Amino acid sequence: MFRKNSLSIFDAANFFLKIVDRDAGSTITPLKLQKILYYAQGYYLAYYDKELFSEDFEAWAHGPANEAIYNKYKKYGFDSIPCPTDETINISDNICAFLSDIWQTFGIYDGKFLEEQTHKEEPWIKARKGCAIGERCHNIITKESMKDFFKTVINDV
């Protein structure tokens, strides 16, 4: 079992939604947000041996997704999610720095590119086992499989 942070997936989502430089033309769609959150969780598990947030990702047809995040932002479809105005961010400086690094690394890509990347990675592939291509799948991508995979990624760098 992993040690817990008090952060929720919505705290992390709000951080990413606020960090987007919309004036410079940057955008964040629901698809991109899902993948950025997935990578944040994966790398956090690998670096710190604890979860960034407790919520899980499922192995959906378009890559890792969290159903609560999907339900909150699905109304935006393929459009960019606007900056939240009423959400305050109460995240430690260390976690802010970590999330900023994740954004610097993955925020330059669009959601479709990130989706394609996750489709090549073991945690999603393993969780999709038994599900047909395009089939709705609610199999959990385990934090253990994410940690193991992302540890190999950081060790290869």
Language model: regions and residue ranges:
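Domain-edge interaction signal
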Residues: 1-157
